[in-house]
Swiss-Prot record:
The lineage of its organism: Eukaryota, Metazoa, Ecdysozoa, Arthropoda, Chelicerata. SUPFAM superfamilies: Scorpion toxin-like (SSF57095). This is Toxin BomPI. PROSITE patterns: LCN_CSAB. Belongs to the long (4 C-C) scorpion toxin superfamily. Sodium channel inhibitor family. Alpha subfamily. CDD domains: neurotoxins_LC_scorpion (cd23106). Disulfide bonds join C12-C63, C16-C36, C22-C46, C26-C48. GO terms for molecular function: sodium channel inhibitor activity; toxin activity. Has the structural arrangement of an alpha-helix connected to antiparallel beta-sheets by disulfide bonds (CS-alpha/beta).
Amino acid sequence: GRDAYIAQPENCVYECAKSSYCNDLCTKNGAKSGYCQWLGRWGNACYCIDLPDKVPIRIEGKCHFA
């Protein structure tokens, strides 16, 4: 696994206000834990600890929300 911003299918981060929301999201996806990183590179976004390799993460490039 890796520590990273978990991504939605369009390479967009999950915006957040509370770490509890991110912890639930991350652990549901197989991570050890997660928290809301405030004022990070992509604003307030969920960051996961030890997220499985099969789960998409935010990478360089634009976020493509339809």
